[in-house]
Amino acid sequence: MEFSVKNGSVEKQRTGCLVVGVYEPRRLSPAAEQLDKLSDGYLSNLLRKGDLEGRVGQTLLLHNVPNVPADRVLLVGCGKERELTERQYKQTIQKMVQVINDTGSTEAICFLTELHVKARSVYWNIRFAIEAIQENGYQYNEFKSVKPEIRRELRKIVFNIANRKDLTVSEQAVEQGKAVALGVIAAKNVANCPPNVCNPKYLSGLAKGLAKEYDNITTTVLDEKEMAALQMNAYLAVSRGSENDAYLSIIEYKGSPNPAAKPIVLVGKGLTFDTGGISIKPSDAMDEMKYDMGGAASVYGTMKAIAEMKLPLNVIGVLAGCENMPDGNAYRPGDILTTMSGLTVEVLNTDAEGRLVLCDTLTYVERFDPELVIDVATLTGACMIALGNHNSGLISPNNTLANDLLNAAEQADDKAWRLPMGEEYQEQLKSNFADLANIGGRLGGAITAGVFLSNFTKKYTWAHLDIAGTAWKSGAAKGATGRPVPLLSQFLINKAGV
């Protein structure tokens, strides 16, 4: 899809479809009012007859509107004026695309980005519209023998802006919106890939592919022999039951004009399939455990997005690829593992494997002397119980970093909620036989998992995002969401100051 912006009068637009808003109850938006005057009251006459009330999601497609040069005019309901929320705005944008795709139009000029969305700017309206449109058109058909028929559909959208002074920021919104949407799609494609294809080696191949695609990215991959030499014993214990070797992929993006600038490090849990190991999961919905690499997928997508945007930052993305399978060689409940940091961990449940992979990875990234580290993981079912599918869980001992992430989450409409930390949660991780237990009991499971990781992050500023509830959807709409690529991308945009 091609996107652009311009500043022009609605009555002069020659296009396949002109899109304007209608407020509830039956009130024309400013752009629609101009069309109404041009057409001698044609639109207002239709509203008086009750053809469109203006509720969010309602549409009315018109042909041959008097004196209007556009082939079609699409009226889109926008709800009550000045009360439009982000969610409703997304509905209006996606409904617009759905309707136009059912016509013969391949291009459209959209005036919906001129609408007032609560506490949002023109920049946000345009960027979010692009992300919503790309999300609406996403399909994963890689493994279908009969591909859906590709029909003539919308290929170009021009967003009109009311004030010429907003052109520069609007053009930036287009470029950043396209990049973030591309990152989200990349993350979805990786996460949706079946586990018999997307194993840890496949994941490392994708990481290497970024280095070939972008000049300012280099990729290093560690195999199990190299990890063993580094004493990454907890990570490797999880991998022991699988015939697919573990691989740790390090993607280095250098965009800062100061090559010595400390990097921001993103660590993604990459369990390409998680059976639970010896503590095996129930069979119901186990197929969805291919999404246990959602953290790695989102880091991969974010690295792609920032490379597209050419952000002036140094960022390192780490994909911790591994598979947790039951086998005669698999690690067991009761095992005690010596981590790369030297701390020992008693395994009480082999299905709490993500934190074992991450603890060694978090120790490994100390060598980069990072400005800060954010790990992203589908870590706990407890986070899903606590926050549902709407908010990612956030844990950090650093208020500044936590607030920066929450601010980015709000800006990107990729919500997160901060969970507490404290010594009392550390108490739940005590072991009679080792420095730590790998689980802390049923209560506060999302928090104790994050607190467990905090023991391996003492040498840098750190935050943890638990995306177990937000990385994918179940049911009829089953599939990866690409979250939290928008949150992470926005955080990095803010850090870059662009």
Curated annotation (Swiss-Prot):
The active site is at residues 281, 355. GO terms for cellular component: cytoplasm. Binds 2 manganese ions per subunit. It is found in: Cytoplasm. It catalyses: Release of an N-terminal amino acid, Xaa-|-Yaa-, in which Xaa is preferably Leu, but may be other amino acids including Pro although not Arg or Lys, and Yaa may be Pro. Amino acid amides and methyl esters are also readily hydrolyzed, but rates on arylamides are exceedingly low; Release of an N-terminal amino acid, preferentially leucine, but not glutamic or aspartic acids. Mn(2+) 1 binds at residues 274, 351, 353. GO terms for biological process: proteolysis. InterPro entries: Leucine_aapep/pepB, Macro_dom-like, Peptidase_M17_C, Peptidase_M17_leu_NH2_pept, Peptidase_M17_N. Its main location: cytoplasm. It comes from the Bacteria. Keywords: Aminopeptidase, Cytoplasm, Hydrolase, Manganese, Metal-binding, Protease. Mn(2+) 2 binds at residues 269, 274, 292, 353. GO terms for molecular function: manganese ion binding; metalloaminopeptidase activity. It holds the Pfam family Peptidase_M17_N. Its cofactor is Mn(2+). Presumably involved in the processing and regular turnover of intracellular proteins. Catalyzes the removal of unsubstituted N-terminal amino acids from various peptides. This is Probable cytosol aminopeptidase. It comes from Glaesserella parasuis serovar 5 (strain SH0165). The lineage of its organism: Bacteria, Pseudomonadati, Pseudomonadota, Gammaproteobacteria, Pasteurellales.
